[in-house]
Amino acid sequence: MPTESLQTGSMVKPVSPAGTFTSAVPLRILNKGPDYFRRQAEPNPKRLSAVERLEADKAKYVKSQEVINAKQEPVKPAVLAKPPVCPAAKRALGSPTLKGFGGGGGGAKSEGGAPRETLKLEILKNILNSSEGSSTGSGHKHSARNWPAPRADAAELHRHSFAESLRARPAPGRGSPQEGGSHVGRRPPEPTSSAAAAADAFLHVSHSSSDIRQGPGARPLKAILPCSSSAPPLPPKPKVAAPAAVKSPEAEAAEPAGGVGRRPSLQRSKSDLSDRYFRVDADVERFFNYCGLDPEELENLGMENFARANSDIISLNFRSASMISSDCEQSQDSNSDLRNDDSANDRVPYGISAIERNARIIKWLYSIKQARESQKVSHV
């Protein structure tokens, strides 16, 4: 080994354990003292909520001074409402057992009212459960004296209206006080102060209308229908006249005008149809009859060359017009009587078709062309 390394090794002093601890722990932590470690051990301080942070920075984004001064309170959890205490529970609270319990529990009052209230609530629950299970006559009488009479529900009102419908309907001339209750389904009028006792007793109606009983204190029915029928009588239906049977004079006057306006095409005569189909433009007639030739050219060619073609086309026009008019008559007859459909089907239609007509026109034009060529040859 070199001598320099031995000299450095001999110069190193032995390190004590106290020196090792002081060198490992920084000096700034030692100067902070024991409070620093206690704060680290404690839980983190409560962080501000979003509402509180917005409340602190409200002046940055709000211009109104009223809004800045107003403070938004945090939302509190809903407090559970106490159940309502019935009169029987109030009487149980005033019983000597609870009074003795309250007198003996003076130490509980000194400690605080909360434990005493919880004990009372538990005792009340036990009393209510026991009172619901036991049904004694004295308790029913006592509750009937304290509680007001129950109001009639929908079923009782329905029974009352059903019983009112069973009453005999008075004559129209007499001023009977039962006119308001004679109709089925009408609600009875509110009872006055004089009839308050009679309104408390309800009518008990059985399944059949013949068995009708009254409660004590109610007025008897003045008139009851005979017991032969097992259902309440239905009111007579008003006679409504059929709308088609009765017609006003205005409707009768409006009907012919409307009928004429709806079907104007069926009122045409044969002459109208013939005029309609014979009103053809002069150019079309000249083309089909004389191949569009001028009168001078027709005189040069000779009218006898066009006589046969003219007769064919004119007869075709007459027949087509008569056929259309006969078809219209057949449609009118078929609408009025269904038997004419069979006769129309049995009738053979006119034999000239569009193809045959075109063939005749082409043949006629070809004959004209041949006549022109023969005339040119004769002139040469």
Curated annotation (Swiss-Prot):
It holds the Pfam family FAM110_N. Residues 127-138 have a biased composition (Polar residues). One of its GO terms (cellular component) is cytoplasm. The keyword Cytoplasm applies. Residues 92-272, 327-347 are annotated as: Disordered. Keywords: Cytoplasm, Cytoskeleton, Phosphoprotein. It comes from the Eukaryota. Residues 239-248 have a biased composition (Low complexity). The modification Phosphoserine is found at residues 248, 311. It is found in: Cytoplasm; Cytoplasm, Cytoskeleton, Microtubule organizing center, Centrosome. Residues 153-162, 336-345 have a biased composition (Basic and acidic residues). Residues 100-110 have a biased composition (Gly residues). Belongs to the FAM110 family. PANTHER family: AGAP005440-PA (PTHR14758), PROTEIN FAM110B (PTHR14758:SF2). This is Protein FAM110B. It comes from Bos taurus (Bovine).
